[in-house]
A protein has these predicted regions:
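N-terminal Rossmann-like NAD(P)+-binding domain of SDR-like oxidoreductases, especially those catalyzing
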Residues: 1-148
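Glycine/proline-rich active-site loop of Rossmann-fold NAD(P)-dependent oxidoreductases
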Residues: 123, 148-161, 168-171
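C-terminal substrate-binding subdomain of Rossmann-fold SDR/epimerase-dehydratase oxidoreductases
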Residues: 13, 17-20, 160, 166-171
Length: 171
């Protein structure tokens, strides 16, 4: 896998902080004079959301409110090309559309039908993102991911599980 430190450009910064700390988020935006935010902070394990929904509400709902508050304050101070090119990219999930039967499909126009605390928290964050776009004009883009893969991913997730089974010649 690739690390940020492997990138030739040094204008990409990874900041490890608490998404619920609005002042810290705003400080990071203004300190680095950003022109895009790629929001990847989330609690994302469906089973854990059932046994411990509070952390999902905190990170995925209160955290997005904190991020939106900081982003709006930052965006309000931008002028010219910086304002014209600024974007907040919000990573969501296909889980917001609910469970599908084997032959069903959905599009981004499908109604939300969350079926777990995780998907409900992500649907809530999607609604907040859209509200900030429509109410305040904050430029946003939501991406609904499914079965993403990366280092340190939990082994029961689809892609690591499939790879593991293939390596063991299992179905």
């Amino acid at each position: 896998y690739i690390s940020i430190s492997d990138l030739p450009q040094k204008d990409v910064v990874f900041i490890h902080n608490d998404i619920c700390d609005t002042a810290a988020v705003y400080s990071a935006l203004s300190d680095y004079n950003v022109n895009a935010i790629f929001h990847l902070a989330a609690e994302s394990h469906v089973d854990r959301s059932i046994s411990s929904p509070g952390s999902f509400v905190k990170t995925n709902i209160l955290g997005i409110f904190s991020l939106l508050s900081a982003a709006m304050k930052y965006y309000s101070g931008l002028r010219g090309w910086q304002r014209d090119t600024f974007k907040l990219v919000h990573t969501s999930t296909v889980e917001v559309y609910g469970d599908l039967d084997a032959h069903d499909y959905f599009t981004e126009y499908a109604p939300f039908r969350p079926s777990s605390p995780y998907s409900a928290s992500k649907a809530s964050s999607d609604h907040l993102i859209r509200a900030w776009f429509h109410t305040y004009g904050l430029p946003v883009l939501t991406v609904n991911c499914s079965n993403i893969y990366g280092p340190r991913q939990l082994p029961e997730k689809l892609i690591p599980l499939t790879i593991h089974k293939a390596l063991k010649n299992e179905k």
